Amino acid sequence: MLGGECTGKTSLAQALSVDFKIGYIPEVLRDFVDQCQRSPRVEEQDAILLAQCDAIGEALSELDPGATGPILICDPSPWMTAIYSLQYFGDQAMFAKAQALMLALANAHQFNWFHLHCADDIVWRADGLQRDGPSHRANSLALIEQYPPLRGIAGHDRVEFLQGGLDERRRISQCRLDDLAKCPECLGAPVINAEIIAMHSWRRKQTAKPDKSPIDSCTRIC
């Protein structure tokens, strides 16, 4: 899942998790803010990115190796950590780190990334510590468009831009995912690279379970 604050990512991700009967990976950043009662600092961005990817890797390791189609919903994609790092700290280095981790996961577990990008055309609502305002949300959208995830990497660079209410976004997402399920080769071959809402991870086969717990990682950040 891609999108700035208050763009309906979580509502859509949870709905699609039910629709497709697949796992849902929540946002490490939100857990961090809830536990630490503050926004992360620049030096904590790496740990948040790693914890988000660890959660995805652990969920992938629990799946049936023969599973196909949409297999996991990530709310949000690890790419959003890189977007926020640039937006709030002026740090572009996180893009390379996010790409390396995302492709390592894709290579290890043999799946393709597919992203759903939620527009900012819904009413902005404050929720306490984490949200900064409509202008910040608009900045996030602009940065996602300027720095799309995994650009130019065959099979992993598909992004669907979603506008409208939840029902409309849900309908379009269902249709798009159904189309891809009928034509998985449309995503291209898996990347062979040692260097991963995405909202959706596209499954080919499964490998080993990672060692680190994302909950432990988040606790250590605080």
Language-model-detected regions and their locations in the chain:
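Conserved lysine of the Walker
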Residues: 9
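Conserved nucleotide-sensing/catalytic segment adjacent to the nucleotide-binding pocket
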Residues: 38-93
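The conserved Walker
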Residues: 5
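Conserved substrate/cofactor phosphate-moiety recognition/catalytic segment
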Residues: 14-54
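A glycine- and Lys/Arg-enriched "phosphate-lid" helix/loop adjacent to the NTP-binding pocket
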Residues: 89-168, 178-181, 190-192, 207
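Non-Sec secretion/translocation targeting segments of pathogen effectors
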Residues: 219-222
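Hydrophobic anchor at the beta1->P-loop junction of P-loop NTPases
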Residues: 1
